[in-house]
Amino acid sequence: MYKKFFDGVIEVITGPMFSGKSDELIKRIKILTYADIKTLVIKPSVDYRFSQCEIVSRSGLKIPTFLARTTQEIRDLFTRDNYQAIAIDEIQFFDEEIVTFLEQIADKGIRVIVSGLDQDFRRKPFGSLPNLMAIAENVTKLQAVCSLCKRAATTTARKVLNEAQTLIGDQDEYEARCRACHSL
């Protein structure tokens, strides 16, 4: 029933913006670091909000990271060293090829931990994350607080007029909403 720590596994951390996904990812990376498990940490190069060289959470936690634009760049970084784990923040910004790559390395005994949005601002599946959730051994779905009614928020609402699915932003562009308060 339980896997050994070094059995390959895929873990997904998801939820709306402002739910603590990066905090949870950094916490799990630090546990691996304490255990001397060599971990490749990645974030997409398009995520420039807080730092170009670190994953930074809104609570102030931070951890050094490599930047990548494509799955091929991640693959190249991964093969440069003898990594035992890989952690990727904002996974929804990578191409669909990432699902196959992460499944392949998990099958070889690598621990995979990813975080990101599973829904876009329209509450539609976002990027590769829903497909990763389908094959993951562990899915943690976090909640935020609805900016309007203060109930549990499970969605991210866009506050600015822009129809593009991807718009990098923060509190000026987005807020967490519950199902009842989320209007398109």
Curated annotation (Swiss-Prot):
GO terms for cellular component: cytoplasm. NCBIfam families: PRK04296.1-1. InterPro entries: P-loop_NTPase, Thymidine_kinase, Thymidine_kinase_CS. The gene is tdk. ATP binds at residues 15-22, 89-92. It is found in: Cytoplasm. It holds the Pfam family TK. It comes from Mesomycoplasma hyopneumoniae (strain 7448) (Mycoplasma hyopneumoniae). It catalyses: thymidine + ATP = dTMP + ADP + H(+). It comes from the Bacteria. Homotetramer. This is Thymidine kinase. Gene3D superfamilies: 3.30.60.20, P-loop containing nucleotide triphosphate hydrolases (3.40.50.300). Its main location: cytoplasm. The lineage of its organism: Bacteria, Bacillati, Mycoplasmatota, Mycoplasmoidales, Metamycoplasmataceae. One of its GO terms (biological process) is DNA biosynthetic process. The active site is at residue 90.
